[in-house]
């Protein structure tokens, strides 16, 4: 749980956590801020202090919902820094980060980097920043010894959210079964009202519609695979494949809360009509 973060940081010799990227579909950020409409942000978690969230000026109200100490990027003149560095955006961005870090008195110690960013540009900025601030050790939590450990234990709110996703997911699975069993059989295939085959693509389209209607997202797609595809690990299924009787169907669905919060993973293996050896 979040209450463990300070102790885990101390155990692992970390002076700060730096989480960068958007406020959605960015698990480390969402864990602290909740699902927030932040297109780009930086969060600094320092033991004994309220977390510090840097945000774009247009997203100040969204950032305020976090309850954290706020810093607007607009407080720093990036254009002036770009001119100062003769157009070197990477170095200018590093200089802005240096100003931010000095302002929050984070100028030395071990800083663990988390988050979801385009790795190339961010890596270049971090290289510049490391040279500008040599007393900082910018590194990664390769063993995931802090956030993974903290997230292994859930509080009641987290459990309620996971249960809600479980109920939603199993509702969609029930709907899927009803969809399949409501279709007529022609030969060994399920057919639609116009006589055309019901396909994997038809079923997955309907799954996505249900998930959207019930308030979830499906960013990782769904595995709904039949026949040979069902025997290939993590084959998501061929959209044009018809749904046939007696063929193995692997159904693995793992949607998440809107904005990329908690997921729920549910798997079933089906065979319609009868099961072959």
Language model features: what each stretch is:
Residues 1-277:
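Active-site neighborhoods and metal-handling regions in enzymes and metal-associated proteins
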């Amino acid at each position: 749980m979040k209450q463990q973060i300070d102790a885990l940081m101390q155990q692992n010799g970390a002076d700060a956590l730096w989480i960068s990227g958007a406020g959605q579909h960015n698990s480390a950020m969402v864990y602290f801020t909740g699902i927030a409409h932040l297109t780009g942000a930086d969060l600094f978690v320092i033991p004994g202090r309220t977390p510090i969230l840097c945000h774009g000026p247009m997203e100040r109200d969204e950032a305020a919902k976090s309850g954290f100490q706020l810093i607007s990027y607009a407080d720093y003149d990036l254009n002036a820094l770009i001119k100062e560095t003769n157009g070197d955006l990477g170095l200018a961005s590093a200089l802005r980060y240096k100003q931010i870090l000095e302002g929050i008195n984070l100028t030395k110690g071990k800083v663990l980097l988390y988050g979801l960013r385009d790795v190339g540009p961010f890596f270049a900025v971090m290289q510049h920043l490391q040279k500008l601030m040599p007393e900082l050790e910018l590194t990664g939590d390769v063993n995931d010894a802090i956030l993974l450990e903290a997230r292994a234990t859930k509080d009641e709110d987290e459990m309620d959210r996971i249960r809600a996703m479980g109920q939603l997911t199993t509702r969609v699975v029930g709907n899927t079964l009803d969809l399949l069993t409501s279709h007529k059989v022609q030969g060994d295939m399920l057919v639609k009202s116009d006589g055309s085959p019901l396909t994997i693509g038809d079923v997955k389209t309907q799954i996505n519609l249900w998930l959207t209607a019930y308030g979830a997202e499906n960013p990782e797609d769904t595995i709904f695979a039949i026949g040979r595809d069902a025997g290939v690990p993590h084959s998501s299924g061929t959209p044009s494949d018809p749904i046939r009787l007696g063929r193995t169907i692997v159904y693995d669905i793992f949607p998440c809360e809107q904005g990329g919060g908690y997921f729920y993973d549910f798997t079933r293996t089906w065979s319609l009509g009868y099961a072959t050896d």
